């Protein structure tokens, strides 16, 4: 089952397994399905360029990193917003260095090809139908393909918690939450060690073990990001369109049930963190 929003730039997907049960795919899941299919097919049919890149936003699943590693392609992270993926494509074209392979974000947007500089659900729909037909020749459903990806790359699960804080007081509270975390970065989150703390407003990445500080290499933005042990992560940013502060997070499990449990534990920790700051 496929559905787009009214301007056809985001694609929602529900897939059926061999038992007739339907599964809703998150934007991370459908994006990874398409990334793996598009890059994998190109690799099989004509090979991949030495300077090819998969592009994702910083709040998008780390499974994308695993896909890039598997196919030995480059990976570029950009700030939230598909325009930043479009800017990378323009940069490839103007510099004559680098080739765009695929780009996506967790909020159900991706771009196949370079005909546009924004997410495109029309071409994504076509590609996903093509992928479904391809997997059917292997007696597989799209859900089977997703499970195969979990087995190959790891059982990644990503989620988000949002807190709505309206009005001038709410805006001040959102800033207070971010500044509190900025001044007091956690050493551990839900049992995961904080390996690096990224502050995109200060343009710094601090190694929490060595204290070494480097640049993010991205435009400044009021965003905090924590690289955690075991390929987990947490990102905090204010919404650009609503009076909300958003806590994005991701974990990697050893099975679907393990991933569910670890994600739920992370969610509880995030809520506890919010309550403590509030």
Regions found by a protein language model. Give the residues of each.
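Short acidic/histidine-rich active-site segments
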Residues: 2-4, 103
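Hydrophobic, small-residue-rich alpha-helical packing segments that form membrane-like cores
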Residues: 4, 11-35, 40, 44, ...
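Short glycine-rich anion-binding loops that position phosphate/pyrophosphate groups of nucleotides
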Residues: 5-9, 107-109
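A generic beta-sheet turn/junction motif
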Residues: 6, 240-242
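Phosphate-binding and adjacent anionic-ligand microenvironments
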Residues: 21-23, 41-237, 244-246, 255-261, ...
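Active-site beta-strand/loop architecture of penicillin-binding DD-peptidases
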Residues: 250
């Amino acid at each position: 089952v496929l559905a787009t929003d009214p301007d056809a730039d985001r694609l929602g997907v529900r897939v059926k397994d061999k038992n007739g049960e339907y599964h809703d795919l998150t934007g991370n899941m459908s994006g990874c399905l398409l990334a793996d299919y598009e890059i994998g097919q190109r690799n099989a049919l004509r090979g991949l360029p030495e300077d090819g890149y998969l592009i994702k936003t910083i709040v998008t699943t780390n499974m994308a990193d695993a896909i890039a590693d598997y196919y030995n392609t480059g990976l570029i992270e950009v700030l939230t917003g598909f325009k930043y993926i479009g800017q990378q494509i323009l940069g490839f074209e103007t510099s004559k260095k680098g080739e765009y392979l695929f780009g996506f974000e967790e909020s159900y947007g991706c771009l196949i090809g370079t005909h546009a500089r924004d997410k495109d659900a029309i071409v994504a729909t076509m590609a996903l139908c093509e992928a479904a037909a391809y997997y059917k020749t292997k007696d597989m459903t799209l859900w089977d393909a997703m499970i195969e990806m979990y087995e190959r790359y790891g059982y990644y699960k990503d989620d988000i918690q949002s807190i709505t804080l309206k009005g001038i007081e709410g805006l001040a509270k959102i800033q207070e939450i971010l500044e509190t975390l900025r001044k007091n970065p956690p050493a551990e989150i839900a049992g995961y060690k904080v390996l690096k703390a990224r502050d995109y407003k200060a343009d710094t990445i601090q190694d929490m073990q060595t204290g070494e500080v480097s640049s993010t290499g991205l435009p400044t933005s009021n965003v905090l990001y924590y690289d955690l042990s075991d390929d987990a992560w947490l990102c905090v940013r204010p919404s650009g369109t609503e009076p909300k502060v958003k806590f994005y997070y991701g974990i990697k499990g050893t099975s679907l049930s393990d991933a569910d449990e670890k994600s739920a534990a992370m969610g509880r920790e995030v809520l506890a963190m919010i309550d403590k700051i509030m």
